[in-house]
Amino acid sequence: SPEKVQQALTNAYPQIATTLINEFSSDNIDDIGADNIYSNFLTRETAYWQPILEYNNVDGLQNIWDYHYKAIGQANAALDAIETTLHNDASLNPAKGEALVARAYAHFCLVNLFSQAYNPNTSSSDLGIPYITRPEEEMNPQRQRGTVAEVYQQIAADLEKGLTLIDDSYY
């Protein structure tokens, strides 16, 4: 139903922030951990490019990965419902657009955190992340990692298509 599509879209956004881990991976971190009131093992491991061994940290890498792919799964479930069950009902175009944009956003966050930064000279060979466009139908499927360039092309395609479908009538 359209209501269930909207409910799925409510969860199509990552329920975790990546700002902390991104900040620690930048050159903005202080040299002395005592100056950082949020200093902990994750902070030190990330700032000094050491393996991250603290597994129970809410903002840890595994949770960031999981929450973003859960959001992608919700966006894909909404898209699948619109395309199959609701037969591409035109009144749901704004919801379809939102799902495409939400999927692009989550992939954008992941490729920025888990892949090399986009470089036009190397992006066609740098490993990206799996770009998931369909709901999962099997447990733990093997996913192919495209290149960074391919991931950005898919992000751009989702954004371009999604933005043409979004309007204020749905909201």
Give the residues covered by each predicted segment.
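Acidic, glycine-rich segments characteristic of secretory precursors and extracytoplasmic regions
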Residues: 1-29
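Acidic helix-start/capping segments at beta-turn-to-alpha-helix junctions
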Residues: 29-35, 95, 101-102, 132
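Short alpha-helical hairpin
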Residues: 32-56, 131
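Secretory-pathway/luminal and periplasmic proteins that interact with or process carbohydrate-rich
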Residues: 17-23, 38-39, 106-118
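Inward-facing hydrophobic residues that define packing positions of alpha-helical scaffold repeats
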Residues: 72-75, 152, 159
